[in-house]
């Protein structure tokens, strides 16, 4: 039954709020991200019972088209460290199915739009301290151990791949800026007359994403005699 995920007071899945950023959890998630601009982001979750451990990359046909292939290659390489760590303790796992890397509004993908490498880790729930499963007994402590080992493996990978991860993020910003300069459309002008409150919250959200918006310096008339007035129009 809905809601079926971890929610805040308003029944909102806080892990889907990073684009809209309408709740304290999403807003603070963005603040933390832009404070650090991390090279690697891990979003650790608890999934349905009886499922093996999951780690990124997600389904190869469900990746956002703006996410570079190199991002997915680095994701797979980092995950190979996780696989080795789980192999050592006999924990079963799966990857490249069941989950996607498409929606940028969640923790396991937002950074993919900013030069980070994001990973999702999902541990099957014991629904308590002990659960019998077809593959044996699962204890709550065992689930914690899996997540802890996966975290340590990710840190090990990030250290070993440090120079390449730094280079990837640098190249990502350089390439996207270069591609933007080649676009025929270099900006958008929008009017706020009659919708001041909507405009206020829109501008507020752009600021949360560190997207620069400027007030129009002078009156402007666009094609089709559309008029934009200084003081009530903005360019992004």
Model feature map: region roles:
Residues 1:
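Glycine-rich, aromatic-flanked loop segments that form ligand/cofactor-binding clefts
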Residues 8-17, 22-28, 32, 36-37, ...:
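Intrinsic-disorder/low-complexity accessory segments
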Residues 46:
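Detector for the c-type heme attachment site
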